[in-house]
């Protein structure tokens, strides 16, 4: 009975995750702490962290600029966190850790269902469920209050609905697909990679199956995902009565990635942020210097 196995996988992952987060009692740090501070304060009507010169975690790295002048895309997860803190209170990140646990369990369930969609064989899904039950790394990651897990979960289920559309041509399943992808990109902006993948698949489907509505959905996805992120940024800027810059760009990250890191090969270094802030958050000047370095 695969439905029983799927339910068992969800319950097992959720129980292990809940035991873990309540045993460890982790607290946020680094970017996670900045987002916690901002979300918990905005939930109480305080928008000071969005202004330059504000007192926030590791503020010395930002040369007096607001964290969100450098990384405005983080406001997507700030919005999600703020909603949670308005409902459950601002004293702890534990509500978001619980949501992380449920999202890991839901993501595992989504992977199992996608396996069934693609292969159509209970035996293969059974093997995948057993493998997922033994994969505890994402469960241990639930103490990290960031957008990774929520974004991953939403992207996996968006993939499930997109595959369902390809297999059934039922247009209504594109609605949850689009909504979940928007939430995924808000939680973790890196999940734009899913948008790219979805658009490519929809274009191929358009050409192969002559389903021209697929290309319309691809266009709608791009507008919804990118537009919602920009709308959230503008909303917070308006609420805080301030102006937020465009932030560190992909060109600066490319320059950063080509340089050595003080942490580990291929890992983070301060070059992208330093270029941006040293040019007074002028992205054109910063990118010009980055291209010269590249």
Feature map (PLM): residue ranges:
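Start-transfer (signal-anchor) and selected internal transmembrane alpha helices
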Residues: 1-21, 215-223
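Membrane-interface alpha helices of multi-pass inner-membrane proteins
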Residues: 173-188, 198-199, 220-225
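Loop-to-helix entry region of an early transmembrane alpha helix in multi-pass inner-membrane enzymes
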Residues: 66-82, 87-106
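Short acidic/glycine- and proline-prone juxtamembrane loop motifs at membrane-interface regions
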Residues: 140-151
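Membrane-proximal stem/loop segments at transmembrane-domain junctions that anchor or position
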Residues: 47-63, 237-294
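Membrane-interface transmembrane helices that cradle and orient dolichyl/undecaprenyl
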Residues: 119, 156-173
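Extracytoplasmic loop-helix module adjacent to an early transmembrane segment
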Residues: 8, 17-73, 81-86
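Transmembrane-helix signature of polytopic, membrane-embedded enzymes
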Residues: 94, 108-134
């Amino acid at each position: 009975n695969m439905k029983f196995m799927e339910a068992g996988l969800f319950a097992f992952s959720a129980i292990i995750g809940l035991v873990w987060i309540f045993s460890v009692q982790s607290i946020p740090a680094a970017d996670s702490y900045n987002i916690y501070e901002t979300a918990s304060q905005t939930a109480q009507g305080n928008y000071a962290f969005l202004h330059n010169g504000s007192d926030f975690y590791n503020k010395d790295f930002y040369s007096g600029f607001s964290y969100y002048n450098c990384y405005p895309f983080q406001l997507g997860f700030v919005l999600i966190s703020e909603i949670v803190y308005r409902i459950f209170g601002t004293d702890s990140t534990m509500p978001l850790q619980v949501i992380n646990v449920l999202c890991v369990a839901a993501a595992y369930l989504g992977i199992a269902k996608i396996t069934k969609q693609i292969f159509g064989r209970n035996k293969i899904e059974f093997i995948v469920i057993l493998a997922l039950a033994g994969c505890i790394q994402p469960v241990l990651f639930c103490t990290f209050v960031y957008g990774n897990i929520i974004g991953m979960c939403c992207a996996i289920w968006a993939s499930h609905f997109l595959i369902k559309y390809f297999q059934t041509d039922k247009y209504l399943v594109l609605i949850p697909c689009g909504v979940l992808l928007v939430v995924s990109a808000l939680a973790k902006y890196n999940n734009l990679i899913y948008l790219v993948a979805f658009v490519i698949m929809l274009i191929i489907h358009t050409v192969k199956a002559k389903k021209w509505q697929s290309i319309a959905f691809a266009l709608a996805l791009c507008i919804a995902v990118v537009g919602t992120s920009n709308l959230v940024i503008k909303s917070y800027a308006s609420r805080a009565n301030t102006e937020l810059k465009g932030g560190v760009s992909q060109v600066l990250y490319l320059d950063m990635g080509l340089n050595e890191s003080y942490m580990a090969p291929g890992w983070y270094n301060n070059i992208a942020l330093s270029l941006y802030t040293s040019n007074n958050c002028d992205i054109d000047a910063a990118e010009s210097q980055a291209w010269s370095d590249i």
